[in-house]
Amino acid sequence: MSQIFAYCRISTLDQTTENQRREIESAGFKIKPQQIIEEHISGSAATSERPGFNRLLARLKCGDQLIVTKLDRLGCNAMDIRKTVEQLTETGIRVHCLALGGIDLTSPTGKMMMQVISAVAEFERDLLLERTHSGIVRARGAGKRFGRPPVLNEEQKQAVFERIKSGVSISAIAREFKTSRQTILRAKAKLQTPDI
């Protein structure tokens, strides 16, 4: 027999889920208190990082219904929401969002709504990639170096090369510069074959 669950999330401890529970009740959903899952966690946490939501997922079975007051209860961004709804749909769980008129997100209308959300999620992802790429290009143009800082500066590399030419062992040079033999060998190789 299918059951109805509600997921109520609040961000801070000084808030309560009372308004969300009342809104669900006003929409005509009669939910047993033990089937209302309340969680005090930031909205920026992905659903996979929400212990209460994960406990809810373990209880939901095919044919059950999940009621949320707002779409953001199902994820931290459009991509996370889409993933969560898809996961619930694959399990056979109907998801109702009261902020969208109580629409069942697994119905044809709900699926269309999720396609719009998917498009927004893809747009969001593309914008993020574009901003990241342009930020990297801008930083490189400004001379910003990526990765770990070099162990040896150019002056030290030149000193290493001079010591190698004068016959000092790689191990002795590594000890002198307080670094590994491999670092000295890399510096030697770089100086022997300068960038073309």
UniProtKB/Swiss-Prot annotation:
Transmembrane segments: none annotated. GO terms for molecular function: DNA binding; DNA strand exchange activity; hydrolase activity; ligase activity. GO terms for biological process: DNA integration; DNA recombination. Residues 3-143 form the Resolvase/invertase-type recombinase catalytic domain. The keyword Amino-acid biosynthesis does not apply. The keyword Transcription does not apply. Coiled coil: none annotated. This is Serine recombinase PinQ. The lineage of its organism: Bacteria, Pseudomonadati, Pseudomonadota, Gammaproteobacteria, Enterobacterales. The gene is pinQ.
